[in-house]
């Protein structure tokens, strides 16, 4: 029997896919457990804000245990990333347990603030005064921590970490959008479809194209025709910046509302200046998106560590001295790549958002197109992860000889 099981051994990709499906089942089940009935929710016309929340696994159409999604977790990752960016050596020396505790404690604090904001903005005033608000906050925080735990487990034993949860949330949001009669000419509709297709091709270009910086490899003496190069993606941060930027924007809005409400109880919940119906709100979001895209890309590239690796191995760039000169050269190249990639993604997301200010009657269709773009971008990253595991399965018979 043991021999039969070894003969038909499941590949690692199948095991991980099965685990991810189990995580998604729990997530879908949790989103259907409502804390407050739909009739007690406030009707908000800011549709893109709801769509933005769904891009992080949340849902504010109904108040369920997973309403906050991964917003507090992603926001805590942003804060810790920006703090550690100034001293990468100290960050690399931290144990995984230290990083885990810092991340979870900060997530817990942010989820309390986010819960307070969501309850006051999306639940009717009568229901807020009737119910125990602290108990509702406790339920939301508990659900958020559970979802973070599921995403963390999926990172270890599943596929692509939080990406599948976000993808299911986006699909659910797209299915619940009500498409009304489009009051536009066929030329305008055709133009929108063409722009979406062009955007998808640009995103595919960003993911597939990489920048190659050739260097001299001292160990490469046998194959003189084979050049060694350092490769970076055009957008090293990938699709995670789209979720992080929305998370940071949501936290900024909820944080400002939380602070102002402490001094003025009659403060407006809508805060029209920080919505996607306002050019100021869109501009603030795009600035956050661009800055986070740049800093996260620089964080992942880690030119300081790369220059140390070159110094240890003896490899060097033509015309560049080892050590500090190599680090300055890599920083120069990294700035060019990271700013270009971050700016390109920001422009792709920003054009349709500003377009909704000029043609508000097409805002639902444009938001749907933005969600479709984000969905394809995330799908590309998930497909890249699956391809990596397939490579592992391909070489598994060879690797098993040494394990």
Swiss-Prot record:
Membrane topology category: Multi-pass membrane protein
Keywords from the UniProt entry: Cell membrane, Membrane, Protein transport, Translocation, Transmembrane, Transmembrane helix, Transport
Subcellular location field: Cell membrane
Entry's transmembrane regions: 17-37, 63-83, 105-125, 131-151, 157-177, 186-206, 240-260, 276-296, 339-359, 366-386
Main location as per UniProt: membrane
InterPro entries xref list: SecY/SEC61-alpha (IPR002208), SecY2 (IPR014269), SecY_dom_sf (IPR023201)
Top-rank taxon: Bacteria
One Pfam family from the record: SecY
Example of a GO cellular component annotation carried by this entry: plasma membrane
Biological process annotations from GO: intracellular protein transmembrane transport; protein targeting
Reported function: Part of the accessory SecA2/SecY2 system specifically required for export of possible cell wall proteins. The central subunit of a protein translocation channel.
Family: Belongs to the SecY/SEC61-alpha family. SecY2 subfamily.
Subunit structure comment from the entry: Component of the accessory SecA2/SecY2 protein translocase complex required to export cell wall proteins. May form heterotrimers with SecE and SecG subunits.
Name of protein: Accessory Sec system protein translocase subunit SecY2
Organism this protein belongs to: Staphylococcus aureus (strain N315)
Name of the gene this protein is made from: secY2
């Amino acid at each position: 029997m043991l021999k039969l099981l070894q003969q038909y051994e499941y590949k690692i990709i199948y095991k991980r896919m099965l685990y991810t499906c189990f995580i998604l089942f729990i997530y879908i089940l949790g989103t259907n457990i409502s804390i407050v009935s739909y009739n007690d929710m406030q009707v908000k016309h800011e549709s893109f804000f709801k769509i933005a929340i769904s891009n992080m696994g949340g849902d504010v159409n109904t108040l369920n245990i997973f309403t906050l999604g991964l917003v507090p977790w992603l926001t805590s990752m942003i804060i810790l990333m920006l703090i550690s960016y100034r001293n990468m050596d100290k960050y690399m020396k931290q144990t995984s347990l230290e990083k885990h505790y810092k991340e979870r404690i900060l997530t817990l604090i942010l989820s309390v603030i986010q819960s307070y904001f969501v309850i006051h903005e999306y639940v009717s005033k009568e229901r807020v005064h009737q119910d125990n608000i602290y108990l509702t906050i406790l339920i939301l925080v508990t659900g958020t921590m559970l979802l973070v735990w599921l995403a963390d487990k999926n990172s270890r034993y599943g596929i692509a970490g939080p990406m599948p949860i976000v993808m299911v949330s986006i699909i659910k949001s797209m299915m619940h959008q009500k498409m009304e009669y489009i009051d536009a000419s066929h030329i305008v509709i055709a133009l929108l479809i063409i722009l979406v297709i062009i955007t998808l091709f640009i995103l595919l270009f960003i993911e597939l194209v990489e920048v190659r910086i050739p260097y001299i490899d001292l160990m490469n003496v046998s194959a003189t025709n084979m050049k060694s190069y350092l490769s970076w993606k055009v957008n090293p941060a990938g699709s995670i910046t789209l979720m992080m930027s929305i998370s940071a924007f949501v936290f900024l809005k909820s944080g400002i509302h939380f602070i102002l409400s402490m001094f003025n109880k009659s403060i407006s919940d809508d805060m029209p200046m920080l919505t996607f119906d306002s050019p100021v709100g869109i501009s603030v979001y795009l600035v956050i998106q661009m800055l986070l895209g740049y800093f996260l890309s620089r964080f992942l590239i880690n030119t300081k560590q790369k220059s140390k690796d070159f110094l240890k191995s003896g490899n060097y760039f033509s015309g560049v001295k080892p050590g500090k000169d190599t680090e300055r050269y890599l920083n120069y190249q990294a700035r060019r790549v990271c700013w270009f990639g971050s700016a390109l993604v920001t422009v792709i997301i920003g054009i349709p958002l500003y377009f909704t200010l000029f043609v508000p009657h097409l805002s639902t269709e444009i938001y749907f197109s933005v969600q479709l773009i984000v969905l394809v971008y995330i799908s590309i990253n998930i497909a890249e992860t699956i391809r990596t595991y397939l490579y592992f399965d391909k070489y598994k018979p060879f690797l098993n000889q040494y394990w």
